Amino acid sequence: MSMKSYKARGIVLHTLKYGDSGMVVYLLTDSGGRQSYMVQGVRSARGHGSKLALFQLMFAVEFEGLESSRMQMHRFREVRSGIVLQSLPFDVRKSTIALFMAEVLYRLVKECEPNQRLFDFVWGSVAALDALDEGVANFHLWF
């Protein structure tokens, strides 16, 4: 089985529990539109909590992925934070807005074709929401 490696950026739109310790992560990526990734061992008791933290909704990640010609689902070789978020994970208002944004994008974006303008807009929106001090309550209207 031939595996092709590639580097990309993505934004977490949705996650699903898979088995005892795995999960399926749906990302909006810069190079391939909406794609699904299998992550094994992320929810096990062996201390992968830091990896699990990367897959919160609307978190921006940079990663090296593996694509197989036989599988529709991709895998991660390496994942790291794409934007260091200062307030989004800790502010309930911002987290709620991020949840809403992720749900809207997950339901609306179905294509697997790259859409660089949409990706850049969403990536910038995550950074803007994290940096915002005032007007947070109306951010979803702007989005």
Feature names for model-found ranges:
Residues 1-143:
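Non-catalytic alpha-helical scaffolds and adjoining flexible linkers that form interface surfaces
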